[in-house]
Amino acid sequence: MSKVYDWFEERLEIQAIADDITSKYVPPHVNIFHCLGGITLTCFLVQVATGFAMTFYYRPTVTEAFASVQYIMTEANFGWLIRSVHRWSASMMVLMMILHVFRVYLTGGFKKPRELTWVTGVVLAVLTASFGVTGYSLPWDQIGYWAVKIVTGVPEAIPIVGSPLVELLRGSASVGQSTLTRFYSLHTFVLPLLTAVFMLMHFSMIRKQGISGPL
């Protein structure tokens, strides 16, 4: 094993990378509230794992979506647990994100030179809310259906571009299969990909600039 490690070490300098990660200075004023961002990340990873597991059983069609969710909850092995953890961690992720935003704002973590870190954080907050909107509709029950109808109907009030925007969100003039397909694609592919990219940017900036000092 040592020869294998030495082979990788010679080419990738693994030890230098590990030393850089583990030797980063942590300011003495840091407390438990500075962990809120990390908890949000943990919830996101739980969401990815449990969401991926449910894709094996979920069927994104208006005729089978609700039945597939019922199957997950009643017949699939540990399906009830996986979906419950997914729901709980979703709520926890939103709560931790909100508390994290408040902590950063109240401690002035958005000030120079960390403006871009704040901007990426706001984008992540919007993406988190988008997860909630798109995921809420996937069971395609009465609550999900009417929630989608209301949310996608909001842009209708925008002059000129309102109607085309509504049709873009729904995939047609009314809520139906095209809408569910769009929301499923957003929830399982587009939003996770964007979130991963912006999280990488967010953490890279924090890594480069360090944690902001006390007020």
From Swiss-Prot:
Q: Please cite one Gene Ontology biological process associated with this protein.
A: photosynthesis
Q: Which domain of life is it from?
A: Eukaryota
Q: Keywords in UniProt for this one?
A: Chloroplast, Electron transport, Heme, Iron, Membrane, Metal-binding, Photosynthesis, Plastid, Thylakoid, Transmembrane, Transmembrane helix, Transport
In this chain, heme b 2 is annotated as bound at 86, 187
Query: Which residues make up the binding site for heme b 1?
Result: 100, 202
Recorded hits in Gene3D superfamilies, A to Z, give: Cytochrome Bc1 Complex, Chain C
Subcellular localization: Plastid, Chloroplast thylakoid membrane
Gene Ontology molecular-function annotations: electron transporter, transferring electrons within cytochrome b6/f complex of photosystem II activity; metal ion binding; oxidoreductase activity
User: What does the cofactor section's free text say about binding?
Assistant: Binds 2 heme b groups non-covalently with two histidine residues as axial ligands.
User: Any idea which positions bind heme c?
Assistant: 35
Question: What's a Pfam family this protein contains?
Answer: Cytochrome_B
InterPro entries from the entry? Cyt_b/b6_N (IPR005797), Cyt_B6_PetB (IPR023530), Cytb/b6-like_sf (IPR027387), Cytochrome_b_N_euk/bac (IPR048259), Di-haem_cyt_TM (IPR016174)
Question: What are the disulfide bonds?
Answer: none
Under CDD domains, the record lists: Cytochrome_b_N
Q: What does this protein do?
A: Component of the cytochrome b6-f complex, which mediates electron transfer between photosystem II (PSII) and photosystem I (PSI), cyclic electron flow around PSI, and state transitions.
Question: NCBIfam families, alphabetically?
Answer: PRK03735.1
**Name assigned to this protein:** Cytochrome b6
Lineage, top ranks: Eukaryota, Viridiplantae, Streptophyta, Embryophyta, Tracheophyta
Supply the gene name: petB
